[in-house]
Amino acid sequence: MRNITSMLFSHKPSSDPEASFYEPLLSEHDRNIILPSPPTSHEKYLYVKSGRWLISIFGLLSSTCLMTGMWLFIVATGTYWFSVFAAVSTVYLYVSYLMVNCVGKDFNLRVHRNIQKLNSRGCPAVDILLPVCGEDFEVIHNTWTYVTALDWPTKTVYVLDDKKDPKIRDLAQRFGFNYITRENNHMKKAGNLRNAFTKTTAPFFAIFDADFCPRSDYLKEIMPYFSHDDKIAIVQTPQFFEVRPDQTWVERAAGSVQELFYRFIQVSRDTFGGAVCVGTCAVYRRESLVPFGGTAEIGFSEDVHTGFAVVDDGWKLKYIPLNLAKGVCPYELKSFFSQQYRWALGSTTLCTNPHFWKSNLSFRQKACFLSGMLYFQVTAFATVLATIPGLIMLARFPEHVLWFNATFALPSLIFGWILMPVWSAQDYPFTVNHLKVAQSYSHLFAIKDKLMGTMMLWESTGGAGAATSSANRFLQGRILCGLVTAFSLVFTYGMTYYYVHHGYALVNFLPGLFLTALNTLTNSPFIMNRQD
């Protein structure tokens, strides 16, 4: 159990206007919660340099080697049904790297600063929307403390409480925030935001999830873009996450997992106007959403659909990789699984909608969104299919199991285990590999549910409030992973023993034994739901 007292004191702003009622939280109870603070001046610029060439060159190289080995396996063994998975993976490789990431441009900090200088006059009114739905009281209080420190004279803060919690209402009153509820919780978070859209009036509004703490200069860095270009509808910044030694391994790894998307992929997509809106840590121009009655009305990933809608309507979505707010990741596997499920479902739902293909987005913008959907599909199918080539080779073609066949997979191992930690601007622990297993299985169940029409709706991120349906998906994912892992382990080691006993050279089976053992080690925390 972690003591949060020191964190509360160390992260409290010196100008905290609510210091008089900060004290009672210290003695309420010692909970397993990390309270974030805004990004430091150093953290603010961590994502400005994307390290594009390292990721692009080695990512493309490792993926090409893997795809080459996969296609050679299909041709050599006649396993042509496997070509469906190989084809999807190859298309993803082409679209993601050759059409988006390798040809994207880096963020230009000098241009950004010029925009600040030339468009810094005036302070248009901004509504700050704080949707809450049963999150931890300490987390909410911590975030609101930093919201009050936003340096913008014409801001008005609204708390959007979908739980109608008297404690939250009282806290909002003490902070001087406006408090909004509604009669029902229709469409969950999306409905909450749409309801607030009808009850607020400022020409711009910002959204902060319950755990995201903004820097005081948040609006000063973003608002000049709207006066610089009157066609910009949304300015999106990264979801930057706290990564500290006193967090659970899930929190630390989850924060590191997101860096690639916000530091590299989003920047590449912004080159073509195809960046994704992620809801929180963004500022919106109200005028652009009036035709839709506010943000998108959908039960999951309303942010992605909102961004798509405004771009389709002729507006622009701008992404700037400045870390201007910091939050915390889910601290347990079940919550992380549910979060990733929603994100995969949102992207898949958008790109499988016929309107997406008929939309006004350019070819390159559609490629940006398509690469996201294909990523979820490839990672989902890989959970079960990645081990199949090795198993088929053992079962049917043991004479062709040669040690150097593993060289097709070697660049991918180097890329994930060595180059990614070197590239990362934050800590990149080995446990990231454990978390990617949970991530992949969440994608698998999201796609399965999309195909079968059994999707889960949105729920607030957090371990205590997980819904039964989410818990069931999580348990099913762990069981499936356990079965696949156990079968692969027993079959690989059993068949290897059999073949070596009958005169085959052990050296040719060593790479397979090593990779199977490594796969078992990597999958185990997800299977066992290990939290420490």
Regions found by a protein language model. Give the residues of each.
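Membrane-proximal soluble regions of multi-pass membrane proteins
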Residues: 427-461
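The conserved acidic donor/metal-binding loop of glycosyltransferases
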Residues: 209-213, 310
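N-terminal membrane-anchoring/stem segments of glycan-assembly enzymes
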Residues: 1-122, 172, 379-383, 499-532
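Short, acidic, metal-binding catalytic loop of nucleotide-sugar glycosyltransferases
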Residues: 144-154
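Catalytic donor-sugar/metal-binding loop of nucleotide-sugar-dependent glycosyltransferases
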Residues: 298, 307-325
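Cell-envelope/extracellular polymer assembly enzymes that use nucleotide-activated donors
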Residues: 124-127, 156, 305
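A conserved acidic beta->alpha catalytic loop
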Residues: 153, 161-168, 184-185
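Long helical/loop segments within the catalytic core of UDP-sugar-dependent glycosyltransferases
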Residues: 103-104, 180-204, 216-300, 311-312, ...
